[in-house]
Amino acid sequence: MIKKEFISDWTKEKIGLPADAPLTREALEAYQVKKLRETVAMAKKNSTFYGRLFASVDPERDIMSTKDMQKLPFTSPADLLAEEEGLLCVRPGEISRIVTLETSGTQGKPKRVYFTKEDQELTTAYFWIGLHNMADDTDRALILLPCRRPGSVGDLFRIGAERMDVFTIPYGLPGMRELERGNKGNGRGETFKQELEELLKLMAEKDVTFILGIPGQVAALAQLWTEKRAEAQDPLIVERLEKVKASMRTVLLSADYVSAEARNAIETAWECKIFEHYGMTEMGLGGAVSCYVLDGYHYREADLFFEIINPETGELVKDGEYGEIVFTTLTRKGMPFIRYRTGDRSRFLTEPCPCGCILKRLERVGPREK
């Protein structure tokens, strides 16, 4: 059974509230202030980069409320590119995974984000908790994100899903086989289409009820289903395609902007619920996710602190106003990020969510500027 209140209960446990106590903004913000102080102090002590950046900062004196974070300088992807290991707060031997992100700047030098085993467990736990809002132990989840390497995003999702007894089908990122064969096209050639056709067969064979994937790829899969269904004459093919639609209940889109066209293609094909996830590698992969109301994203306030700033002035905007998302990690040990500018545009939704959860909501995040 889907447990819609699970994320609130988990947050209460994370911040140290008794099970019978209500989750309040006051309790949550007191926890965040404590964690912000601890994070800044830990980073200042253990990181050469943060040691320089926060040389004049005394967390116990300077961070008395969450609003005091605006006194601290920003960090950015440029700092990660320039410093890399200077942001580390643990010995290299404590790092269990390094994620490399290609960039267009600094002559194509990649960004590298470092995680300890404990950091990755935070992500797995978040995936596990978030899934309680949209899936249960009757689901059969097709994972269309990288999942072959231990600790990859799809692998962490698999572990989280299996903790709640969801049957998982770790497939990987569609289109990778085309690239492995040397086709450097746009990922929409005949080989890619053939792979999508194979995926539709797999969905029917495995009674897939849930898909996790990138918006454009899941939309392409749904569009192909629509085309195949419109032209199908063979009763066996019709039966297989209808079986896919009858089984599908939920799609979780992640890793990219969700366009209206992508949503429409999926809804037209399968008439299923579409949840959206917002995150980035620097956040620890998981950032914020739709609740069952499907209006904005609740963000993981026990692990992250979000601010919305005016990108021109760097000043905080009022709740409800648009600006750039800035985040600080509260529980990361290997490579914490403090007031990290994402370049993503959104706003905090000020109306209470009908789901009853008090965790702050972001409006749907727009496409990231290149």
Language-model features: locations:
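Active-site glycine/GP-rich loop and adjacent strand/helix microenvironment
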Residues: M1-L28, K34, E38-T39, M164-K370
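Short, compositionally biased "basic patch" segments
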Residues: E94-K109, V153-F167, L200
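N-terminal Rossmann-like or analogous alpha/beta NTP/dinucleotide-binding catalytic cores
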Residues: Y126, V153-G160, L179, K184-R188
